[in-house]
Structure formats: C-alpha cells, structure tokens
C-alpha cells in the first residue's frame, strides 16, 4: 500500500528529527501507522494527531513508552495513562519496589549470612562428634563388657540426638529469616496481581460501534466463548501500536482502512 509506505517514511523522518529519542529507540522500538477515513466527522481535538499523507489521513503510534512518557505530540496517546507521578499505579508500584528492596536486602544481610555459617558449623560439629564416638566404640569393641556396650550404644544415640537438636536450632534461625523473605514475596505477588487486575479494569477498549469495555471483560468473554484457559490478559496487553491506533480511531469516529506495524532500531534478539 503506497499510503502506508508514505506514512511509514514520515514516521522514520520524524524519529530521526527527535534527537532526544534516539538513544532509547535506537535499541529497538515498535511503531505503527493507521490509515483512516473521516466519514463520521472528526472532532477538532483530533486534528493535531491526523497526518496528511497526500490524499489520505494517518495516525501514528509507538508501543509502550518513550523516555518514560506514554504520549508525545503527533502520536496517539496510551489507551489508559497510568504513569501519573502521584497516581494510583505509581503509588502502589512504589510499594512493590520497596518490597523488592527489602527482599534483596534480607537476602544479602549479615544476619542471614551469619545464620547460614552457624548452620554449617553445627552440621560439621555434629558430624565430627558422632564420628569421634563411633571411632571410640570401635576401639573398645574387643574389650568392653555387655554393660559397657549397652551404655556406649545408648550414649551414641544421645550424642546423635544432641547433634540433631543443635543442627535443628541453627536451621530454625535460617528458616526464620527465609520465612520472612517468603512472606514479603507473597505480599509482593499479591500486590502485583492486584495492581495488574486494577490496571486491566481501568484499561477500556472501544469497539467500532463505540462500546467501551475493560480489557479484563473482553478476555473473560473470549474465554467463555472459546473455552480458552487464558482468563487474564497478558501483561502489557493494549500497550502495542495496533490496539492504541484502533482504539483511538474507534473512540473518535474515524474509520480504519489499513494498518501497519514496523520495527525501528536494532533488531530484537
């Protein structure tokens, strides 16, 4: 499609002119263009985002963010901008980030390292004590009386029991710290899942008929119709170029005609 090729060239030219972008997008970024018709009448605020490509109109988009921003002039914005500094997402993301920091700090803490050293030493000491007494029993085997043999066997059991208790106490110190870390990991997972679900409910997709629904509902309906096990949308659903372009067109009474996505920058590995 000549119009799509022309739109793609305009995007490449625009990217090259945005020098602040190049260090980031040079590593690789997905861009997209959508040819649209204005049959339904176009709201005036859409005009800055419509690009004239010589007889046709096009919308431009990029996936995700560029320099931490979901919107740059000339490109359609994210379907739902969740990156406001003081917004719900950022506040809860900060809590998850803090949990990551605490988990990492505990994993590298001197308390955990000391507890693990104590456990290793307890195991080594226990092994030495048991083997030392076994060697003693072996030396005494030829000359000991029945009563001495009974005592020595009982003493060996007592030594093993004390050794096991010592190792168990040291293991408990390690386990206590690991349990705290697991508790933080569980909290992190729950918070992450809850935040992802919140994002899915806030992220509303608009159909060509103008019906807007949370993407969580869209995936749930698809799962019911098809028997799919994919009840939750994959992370990042709706952040790609095509959903952004189509959603913007559907929301602003623009009729999609043709779409193309293309890669700019280094090839993905």
Regions found by a protein language model. Name each.
Residues 1-269:
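Catalytic cores of nucleic-acid editing and processing enzymes
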């Amino acid at each position: 499609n000549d119009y799509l090729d022309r739109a793609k060239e305009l995007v490449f030219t625009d990217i090259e002119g945005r020098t602040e972008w190049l260090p980031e997008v040079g590593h690789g970024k997905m861009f997209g263009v959508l040819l649209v018709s204005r049959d339904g009448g176009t709201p005036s605020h859409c005009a800055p985002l419509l690009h004239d490509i010589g007889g046709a109109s096009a919308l431009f988009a990029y996936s995700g963010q560029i320099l931490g921003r979901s919107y740059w002039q000339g490109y359609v914005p994210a379907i739902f901008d969740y990156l406001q500094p003081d917004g719900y997402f950022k506040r809860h993301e900060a809590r998850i980030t803090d949990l990551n920091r605490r988990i990492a700090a505990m994993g590298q803490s001197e308390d955990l390292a000391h507890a693990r050293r104590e456990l290793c030493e307890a195991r080594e000491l226990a092994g030495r004590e048991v083997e030392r007494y076994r060697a003693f029993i072996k030396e005494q085997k030829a000359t000991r009386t029945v009563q001495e043999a009974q005592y020595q066997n009982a003493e060996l059991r007592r030594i093993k029991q004390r050794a096991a208790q010592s190792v168990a106490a040291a293991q408990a110190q390690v386990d206590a710290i690991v349990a705290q870390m697991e508790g933080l990991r569980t909290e992190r997972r729950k918070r992450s899942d809850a935040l992802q679900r919140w994002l899915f409910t806030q992220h509303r997709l608009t159909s060509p008929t103008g019906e807007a629904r949370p993407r969580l509902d869209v995936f749930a309906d698809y799962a019911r119709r098809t028997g799919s096990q994919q009840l939750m949308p994959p992370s990042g659903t709706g952040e790609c170029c095509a959903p952004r372009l189509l959603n913007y067109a559907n929301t602003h009474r623009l009729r999609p005609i043709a779409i193309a996505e293309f890669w700019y920058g280094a090839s993905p590995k």
